[in-house]
Amino acid sequence: MSSKVFLRDKVHVNVGTIGHVDHGKTTLTAAITKILSTKGLAENKSYDQIDKTKEEKERGITINTTHVSYETVKRHYAHVDCPGHADYVKNMITGAAQMDAGILVVSAYHGVMPQTREHVLLAGQVGISKLIVFLNKCDLVKEEEWIHLVEMEVRELLNEYKFDGDKTPFVRGSALKALEGTDVEGINKLLEVLDEYIEDPIRDVEKPFLMPVEGVHTITGRGTVATGRVERGKIKISEEVEIIGLKETKKAIITGLEMFKKELDFAQAGDNVGILLRGITRDQIERGQVLAKPGSLNAYHKFLSQVYILTQQEGGRHTAFFSNYRPQFYFRTTDVTGFIKLKKDVKMVLPGDRTELIVELNHPIAIEAGTKFSIREGGRTIGAGTVTEIIE
């Protein structure tokens, strides 16, 4: 863990880039850090540093979510760069769940594409209420009319998924040109809009501590570190937490807290943190579990839910499903297979239906009434739901 201390002298906001593969999310993230680094407000992160894994470099696409941090004069931002490729949507869901607001990157050259639509749907599902649209690659489009048509198409899409498409700010630019240093105006405008359009987040610090585990690392000689975004509550060093879900519940003492390689006295809702846990080995904790205040949460495998099933036009199923249907259920940072039971008076569920479902998961996970989830099958999102009642 680090020896530098994280200063809470500015409002902390979690943002991120979402959108279709190759529309420029990672290039935009790199351009933001480069431009702010010249003002001493960020560490310059190259495209290759953000697209970290060997497979990402070879395929030229983002697979895992990547976190960078930067500041404006007004705020401190934690920025998640989400994968746009359809195969890695589950990592996108994890990243989006950590955001207070999103930057939807749309190539002005290509317009709305399948993952543009899916990411907007999922952003709403995980609780993001505001998006800013960055129309990228504007330098490749010669006709102003074309950019205007793409903007109209995106506004319609936002309205369709209950975002305020009419009032959503649009910023035009070229992330690549900005990264090359020839046209930085779009990036400066985007940062200005981030500061002004996105309100200071209201943090849920009074409720019991809860953090979904996104990653797990070992520090030789120190112990095991769990990383993630604190969903609610506060925690400080020497306090006890429970590790809940997927396996038998375990207890651990917190011996260190860190955010962006700087030490914290305490962590609170909204912080992206690494938590050092005493007495826990690498194989006793995994992504998809949660850290929670002891006694505040339990793991369950059967629940009642209210669900919306997407239409074919929304990228969902083409056909109905029946009892014993077995898709994947995505909660916070985990995905679990389970099966659906329909209520006695319901014979089948059609695309476009809003319905009540009984869900039984293969593994127990930390859930409670109000927990949101996505339903996926064969690489696409087919439904969005909320837990209404725990059964067992």
Swiss-Prot record:
What's in the keyword line of the UniProt record? Answer: Cytoplasm, Elongation factor, GTP-binding, Hydrolase, Magnesium, Metal-binding, Nucleotide-binding, Protein biosynthesis
Gene3D superfamilies, A to Z:
P-loop containing nucleotide triphosphate hydrolases (3.40.50.300), Translation factors (2.40.30.10)
Enzyme class, top EC level, equals hydrolase
* Annotated segments matching region G3: 81-84
Gene Ontology molecular function:
GTP binding; GTPase activity; translation elongation factor activity
Cite the Pfam families for this sequence. Answer: GTP_EFTU (PF00009), GTP_EFTU_D2 (PF03144), GTP_EFTU_D3 (PF03143)
Family that this chain belongs to: Belongs to the TRAFAC class translation factor GTPase superfamily. Classic translation factor GTPase family. EF-Tu/EF-1A subfamily.
Protein name per its UniProtKB record: Elongation factor Tu
Look up and give the organism this protein is from: Apple proliferation phytoplasma
Q: What is the lineage of its organism?
A: Bacteria, Bacillati, Mycoplasmatota, Mollicutes, Acholeplasmatales
By which gene is this protein encoded?
A: tuf
